[in-house]
Amino acid sequence: MPVYGNKNAFVGLVIELRAIGPVPIIIGQGICGLVGTSNRGPTSEAVPIGMPSTGTRLYHSGDLKEAIELAFQQGCPVIYAVRVLGKGNKKASKKVKDGATTPSEVGTFYAASEGIWGNSVIITIEDGEFKATDVEIFAGDGTAGPYALKVCDIIESPRNYVKVNGIPRTIVYNSGDLGEGKVYVDKVNGTITFYEGEEPTTAQTISVYVKYMTRTVTLTDNEMTETYRNIRDLIDLQARLRTSALANFVPKAGALHLPANSTFALEDGSDGQEIVTDDWEEALYLLGNTIAPTTVAITSYEVEPSSYDLIPVLDGFVTWMANRFQPCIGFVSARENESVANLLDLAAGYNNRLLVIEGNGWDQSNPRKNLAVAHAAKEAAVALGESTALAMNSLNGVRDLLVTFNQDEMDALTRGGINVFMKQRGIKPYVSITTATDWQFMRCVDNRTINWIITALDYVCKQFYHQRRTPEVLTALKASIEGILDEQVILGNVERYHVEVMPNEIDVNRVDVELLVQNIGHIERVRVVFGVGVLPKE
């Protein structure tokens, strides 16, 4: 706590500034994480996607691109995407040089993302439509030069000038014309040279104003073409290509000249080794270390055929996230046309309130849409306490179900921990369940509320670490917890709760909190006693 004033003063003011009272909280919600394969796109980062067109531009085609589009169709406001690619993957690239007499490297073009697709990118550099101006002021060094300018490919212009201490020198563009009172401007190499005997001293200032050619850079992969016109320098080139879907540019340290006109293809791009489960695991943990999503979906269920080897990877990931007080629900679809018996056998190996296995998670679109993605996005999009099994929350953008189950099969699968979809004025979950066997943790809607409370508790408790364990502070801690739960009661997400905050009697640095919460119920069964006959008069 800050202390203001001098405690040693005989007469004076000392102020101890303390934080008191309950803590308000702000918790991010509505974030869906997607992990999958695609033909292109970044592999070393979890990319925030704000609109479907961004996903299409970055990932081009493949499961991840389709998943991003489907997730946005569910009304999910924010999506983070991670592309899975094998180890040893590499971006296609090409080093470029300037147009000087002895060319120097000025930077490297890189494909916008890793993979062999980058080898199809062709780059054309040519003169821009407009001229640019280079203005420089620097001190002489006592020699005639040459003095290197920041630009090359200089244009002869009546507006060009070179001055020494404000006195202009006559510009010549041929070294053989250099003479008294003149300065030679080398248009190709971007240098100036003074006449012998008229060398600027270290006490004199050289002022230069010259016109030079800009560059227009065209990128194409024979499907998409991007053109960037009238680029003035390397920094401008780097900035203009920063959001390109095809290629980026990184200047070489110390380089100043624009690259020479040329046409070339990027090369040496690689997809790396075959994708294995470790690659999916790394992608998931990259997502978890970047953002705390509400839900996560993976676009595939296995790497090795008939193994379902990605489900345990997702199972472990969501458990790890919960252990960090950032719980999220993970969604994965089972194999297309899987039998009821095999689905029940699959679910028997899992008991996790944060894992959802979709029994009939594919539609009839071409390509088929992954309903695990749609379900994850819908769970992230709906309000806390609202079930995605509501008819009004039916999945959007899907075309029928590839497989439908009858009532007995849906009941058996639901009891066995497999979530199933039904077609009834829209395609929606029958109940929307996880693989958990305890009824308290069976439904996704209840787990989203539980996850929100866990995240809120972590946020609140962090505000009280290392504070004095006084009755005042404990009261504020209790009020903070009550504040978040009172709001959920008002919103109809929690029916009632009980909270106690007590100092531990043995450990003076510990506080014990007892929290009991009853989630709001969601009507699934209705029993009617229907009496028929003569009713007694009131």
Question: Model segments located where?
Answer:
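A glycine- and small-residue-enriched flexible loop/hinge signal that marks low-structured segments
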Residues: M1-I137, K150-E198, T202-R468, T475-K478, ...
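Short coil/turn motif common to extracellular beta-sandwich-like domains
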Residues: G142-P146
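C-terminal edge-of-domain segments
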Residues: E505-E538
